Amino acid sequence: MNVLLCSINTFKRLYDISAVEVGQHFYWQMGDFQVHAQVLITSWVVIAILLGSTILVVRNPQTIPNFGQNFFEYVLEFIRDVSKTQIGEEYGPWVPFIGTLFLFIFVSNWSGALLPWKIIQLPHGELAAPTNDINTTVALALLTSVAYFYAGISKKGLAYFGKYIQPTPILLPINILEDFTKPLSLSFRLFGNILADELVVVVLVSLVPLVVPIPVMFLGLFTSGIQALIFATLAAAYIGESMEGHH
């Protein structure tokens, strides 16, 4: 019971912290609601890049694949391998979800280093990679949580919740807390790594000539890709775990 109360209090404190603003932000007013426009603008750009490149490649498939078709087929095979390794033989229906997570996070991370967001002037604040905002990473983590709950319940029904008292009912609070910490760890890991990478590059560019930070920028591109892979792999692992019922 103490563990449950502690977790509830933790989430209340996190909710209070979410109301604190650091820096300036650009909002759209929609009725009584304020929408965080910076994240929406950059997210739409990333989605447009993904949709546009996909349409260009698949609208006229060739018998002898060209470079773009070969690249997309390689990416699809890679995502299928990751899904099959983590989920098992029932991986098929989850390939689109895992692939969407991986590609959105990958392109979002790279957009922070390759697209000149800062030159676009806003009335307040500035644009940055979508994954540089905690709202985006939390939303992706919550989607993952919904996915693995759905996977477990759709396969086992209400018997899925029996995992919380395995191997002994004494572990019930800890097993419940584990499901709350999964989205927290997913979201903060991705947000922290992307934010830290962009801050390091900004500080180096302001202190030394542009040539010096270039190796750090290339390292940032590599780590950004790794973070996308880690997020997608963990999401697939959580889905596979909920379907198999083991930890």
From Swiss-Prot:
CDD domains listed in its UniProt record: ATP-synt_Fo_a_6 (cd00310)
Transmembrane segments: 38-58, 95-115, 134-154, 199-219, 220-240
GO molecular function per UniProt: proton-transporting ATP synthase activity, rotational mechanism
Subcellular location per the Swiss-Prot or TrEMBL entry: Plastid, Chloroplast thylakoid membrane
Superkingdom of origin: Eukaryota
InterPro entries, per the entry: ATP_syn_F0_a_bact/chloroplast, ATP_synth_F0_asu, ATP_synth_F0_asu_AS, F0_ATP_A_sf
Lipid bilayer topology: Multi-pass membrane protein
Disulphide bridges: none
Assigned GO CC terms: chloroplast thylakoid membrane; plasma membrane; proton-transporting ATP synthase complex
PANTHER family linked to this entry: ATP SYNTHASE SUBUNIT A, CHLOROPLASTIC
Similarity comment: Belongs to the ATPase A chain family.
Assembly with partners or alone: F-type ATPases have 2 components, CF(1) - the catalytic core - and CF(0) - the membrane proton channel. CF(1) has five subunits: alpha(3), beta(3), gamma(1), delta(1), epsilon(1). CF(0) has four main subunits: a, b, b' and c.
Name of the molecule in the record: ATP synthase subunit a, chloroplastic
Gene: atpI
